């Protein structure tokens, strides 16, 4: 069972923070990444590892760091989180941390795993965790309470409608700058290909899907569901709109109305790595896993490899559970 198991039911409240570290193999001492603002805190990752240690004994420590986004001395953020190391998209080589719970304050602003793994496990050539010298770590972060900080609500009147989208003979009033800021494709269409134009006709998508996209960007109330998620994924991919892709992925993580096979295909088509990781993690039946492999011959190589590794894990669990000696084998070494 994955160490992230306790976080499964918190998918609706979870935020994933991704950090990419350049030239990671040259780390010596302590390094703190650039921060990301989220829910009243500036979040960063801190690594600690010393070159003075013997190569066979050198370890890597990993900490989540949160600095206050306010001067309020009562500021604090209560969280649950776990992290994982990733290599290239879709590959199942990961290292997963235990679940941590912590309340970050101005004086106690870091929490993590000391000596989490061997240094060589990460930087050895072909280990899978350095991709062109870049090391990637993701934190699944669930915030249960924030004190001493009030998140400001955006004033939607600042999104002045200065343009129109015409879809299926219906008109949607939009802020062109808002569209352009969230989509490089729409930026080119609005400012480079058609400078000065304020009305744009969209032919490839339905009125409902375009309205959904605009609602997501304007932070209006909108729900992704089984009827619209596919159109929104295609729209988000075509226009390269991260916010739309994220909303669809969050829906797919929560819903039980979409099959495992469909989620795996979607993770390939739309490069939804987190969806693939969580979907494979939740497969706990060997027969189901074998059926997926047998019935989906068109599955991509990276997903196929990840499913094979999951099969190895399930077989290993079955062997331990079926052992007749009734002794615990985990952690034992042969003499």
UniProtKB/Swiss-Prot annotation:
<dbReference type="InterPro" id="IPR002083">
    <property type="entry name" value="MATH/TRAF_dom"/>
</dbReference>
<dbReference type="Pfam" id="PF00651">
    <property type="entry name" value="BTB"/>
</dbReference>
<feature type="domain" description="MATH">
    <location>
        <begin position="14"/>
        <end position="141"/>
    </location>
</feature>
<dbReference type="Pfam" id="PF22486">
    <property type="entry name" value="MATH_2"/>
</dbReference>
<dbReference type="InterPro" id="IPR011333">
    <property type="entry name" value="SKP1/BTB/POZ_sf"/>
</dbReference>
<dbReference type="InterPro" id="IPR008974">
    <property type="entry name" value="TRAF-like"/>
</dbReference>
<protein>
    <recommendedName>
        <fullName>BTB and MATH domain-containing protein 39</fullName>
    </recommendedName>
</protein>
<dbReference type="InterPro" id="IPR000210">
    <property type="entry name" value="BTB/POZ_dom"/>
</dbReference>
<feature type="domain" description="BTB">
    <location>
        <begin position="161"/>
        <end position="226"/>
    </location>
</feature>
């Amino acid at each position: 069972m994955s160490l992230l198991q306790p976080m499964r039911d918190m998918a609706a409240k979870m935020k994933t923070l991704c950090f990419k570290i350049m030239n990671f193999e040259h780390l010596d001492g302590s390094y703190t990444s650039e921060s990301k603002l989220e829910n009243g805190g500036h979040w960063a990752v801190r690594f600690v590892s010393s070159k003075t240690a013997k190569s066979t004994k050198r370890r890597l420590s990993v900490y989540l760091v949160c600095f206050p986004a306010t001067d309020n001395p009562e500021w604090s953020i209560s969280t649950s989180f776990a992290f994982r190391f990733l290599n290239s998209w879709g590959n199942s080589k990961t290292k997963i941390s235990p679940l941590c719970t912590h309340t970050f304050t101005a004086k106690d602003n870091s929490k993590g795993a000391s000596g989490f793994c061997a240094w060589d496990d990460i930087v050895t050539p072909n280990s899978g965790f350095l991709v062109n010298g870049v090391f990637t770590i993701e934190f699944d972060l669930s915030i249960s309470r924030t004190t001493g900080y009030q998140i400001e609500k955006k004033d939607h009147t600042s999104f002045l409608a200065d343009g129109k989208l015409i879809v299926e003979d219906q008109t949607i009033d939009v802020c062109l700058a808002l569209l352009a800021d969230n989509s490089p494709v729409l930026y080119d269409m609005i400012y480079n290909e058609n400078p000065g134009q304020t009305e744009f006709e969209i032919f490839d998508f339905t009125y409902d899907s375009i309205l959904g996209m605009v609602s997501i960007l304007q932070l209006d109330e909108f729900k992704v569901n089984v009827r619209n998620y596919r159109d929104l994924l295609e729209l988000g991919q075509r226009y390269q709109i991260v916010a739309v892709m994220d909303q669809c992925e969050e829906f797919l993580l929560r819903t039980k109305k979409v099959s495992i096979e469909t989620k795996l295909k979607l993770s390939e088509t739309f490069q939804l790595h987190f969806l693939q990781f969580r979907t494979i993690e939740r497969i706990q039946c060997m027969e189901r896993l074998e059926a997926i492999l047998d019935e989906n011959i068109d599955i991509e190589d990276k997903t196929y490899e990840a499913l094979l590794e999951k099969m190895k894990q399930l077989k290993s669990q079955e062997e331990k559970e079926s052992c007749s000696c009734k002794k615990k084998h985990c952690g034992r070494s042969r003499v």
